[in-house]
């Protein structure tokens, strides 16, 4: 693990630093009559640049010129117990539209919102030390999410949702970067080479 002396403070860098597979351990507190929840899942993040066809497609939904966007990322939520193909029912495309005068601030255009399954517009802002705040107003609720890197292998994420009827929900997540298949194979080959060159 490496401490991040210069955490990402633009969405482009944040997406790139988040690239890959993450194990999410989350706890959800329902501040009404429902029981709390705890679960694990996987999250796959794949950033893309402004030339990706998704940029124009999603920007058109919001009436925003694609030239204002700076790429984005695809997200997939998966079970961490079953080997599954990626399911678009548990996926989202997020487009980054930074403010030209303030690259640490901007808008996120989502083809599908996290809370309400419809296109969603969010605002975002980074603090100088890399804490990302995302605010999203839906038709029937308002969400705030904060996310930051503890180091290059661990992310923290907290969020809250306030509904019109007053009921609220809070979520706390610790996210661990998972090694890729190539990483595992490389480590295995290194161990094999070490064992061959350093016999007992």
Swiss-Prot record:
GO terms for molecular function: lyase activity. The keyword Glycoprotein does not apply. Gene3D superfamilies: 2.40.128.20. Keywords: Lyase. It comes from the Bacteria. Pfam families: CpeS. CDD domains: lipocalin_CpcS-CpeS (cd19433). Its EC number is 4.-.-.-. Covalently attaches a chromophore to Cys residue(s) of phycobiliproteins. Belongs to the CpcS/CpeS biliprotein lyase family. This is Chromophore lyase CpcS/CpeS. It comes from Synechococcus sp. (strain WH8020). The lineage of its organism: Bacteria, Bacillati, Cyanobacteriota, Cyanophyceae, Synechococcales. The gene is cpcS.
């Amino acid at each position: 693990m490496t401490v991040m002396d210069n955490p990402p403070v633009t969405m482009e860098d944040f997406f790139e630093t988040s690239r890959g597979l993450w194990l999410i351990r989350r706890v959800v507190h329902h501040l009404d009559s429902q029981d709390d929840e705890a679960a694990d899942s996987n999250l796959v993040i794949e950033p893309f640049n402004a030339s990706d066809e998704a940029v124009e497609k999603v920007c058109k939904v919001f009436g925003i010129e694609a030239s204002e966007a700076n790429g984005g990322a695809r997200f997939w939520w998966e079970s961490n117990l079953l080997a599954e193909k990626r399911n678009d029912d548990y996926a989202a495309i997020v487009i980054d539209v930074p403010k030209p005068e303030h690259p640490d601030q901007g808008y996120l255009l989502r083809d599908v919102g996290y809370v309400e399954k419809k296109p969603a517009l969010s605002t975002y802002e980074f603090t100088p030390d890399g804490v990302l705040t995302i605010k999203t107003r839906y038709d029937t609720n308002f969400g705030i999410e904060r996310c930051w890197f503890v180091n290059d292998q661990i992310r923290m994420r907290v969020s809250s949702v306030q509904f019109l009827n007053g009921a609220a929900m809070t979520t706390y997540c610790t996210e661990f970067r998972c090694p890729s298949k190539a990483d595992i194979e490389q480590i295995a080959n290194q161990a094999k080479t070490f064992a061959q060159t350093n016999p007992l």
